[in-house]
Amino acid sequence: MSRPLAQAIGEIEKRLRSAGRLSLFLDFDGTLVPLGPDPSAIRLDPATRETLKRISRKGSIATTVISGRAIDDLYMRVGHVEGIVYAGNHGLQIFGRGMYFVEPTAAARSSELCRMSSALVEKLKPFMGAFVEFKGLTTAIHFRITPEENVQQIGTVVRDTIATNPECFQLKSGSKVLEIVPRTNWNKGAAVRWINRRLGDGEILSIYIGDDNTDEDAFRELPDSITVKVGDPAGTLARYQAPDPDAVHDFLLRLTDCELSRSAGH
């Protein structure tokens, strides 16, 4: 059972001060920024961006922003922060700090996914508020502002569409969104492992903060690390729980202060 982050901050700071290097992973929507009815309207607020810049200037902290958004979209909303790694499409795309990766199975199936997404655009036109977002390697079907009585029908339409190619694609559910993703062993946990291996030799303490079902793969990958579920902690593998993005920002400020005192002590 996860513990409230605010109650555990003392023990967390003790671990941070004794760690050699830190690898910080942050989900975007619902973690760094609040969820909203229109994903295209969401931006990282200046205060949080400035905090990320302060953290990224610390040579002993490697920061990754990881999201289900397409990597270009993620980069545009976070903005350029020197030293940050950007991981889009749930880690299927990665770049930053000299790293570059595109998951090959997802890349090979992009054209077929594009055709499937175009078909869904037509099929979902009757449902008010539902829209399809093709993200290159994955596709999201958003229904945050769709009347509740239509949600089940939307799910049926999407599942029937995927059923035409079940060996290549699978469906994942999030907060008021369904995602069509390629069948591959790659997920956010695999992305975390890939990034950490490229940060060099030596012991690394990972911190992962996320709010989505897809973040559970990362929590599973990091059983001995500092893992934080944002929002409802029911069923999570994370050690700690934070109520909202404001609490995440407060934690990041504490992390910055902790790193400053740690650096002063070395």
Q: Model segments located where?
A:
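Mg2+-dependent phosphoryl-transfer enzymes with acidic/Ser/Thr/Gly-rich catalytic loops
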Residues: 2-6, 19, 45, 189-266
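Short amphipathic alpha-helices and their capping/turn segments at secondary-structure boundaries
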Residues: 4-20, 73-80
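Asp-based phosphoryl-transfer active-site loop
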Residues: 17-37, 65, 192
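Hydrophobic "anchor" residues on beta-strands that sit immediately upstream
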Residues: 23-25, 85, 207
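Conserved Rossmann-like nucleotide-cofactor binding loop
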Residues: 31, 71, 214
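Active-site phosphate-binding/coordination module
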Residues: 43-134
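Conserved acidic, metal-coordinating active-site core of Asp-based
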Residues: 119, 127, 133-207, 213-221, ...
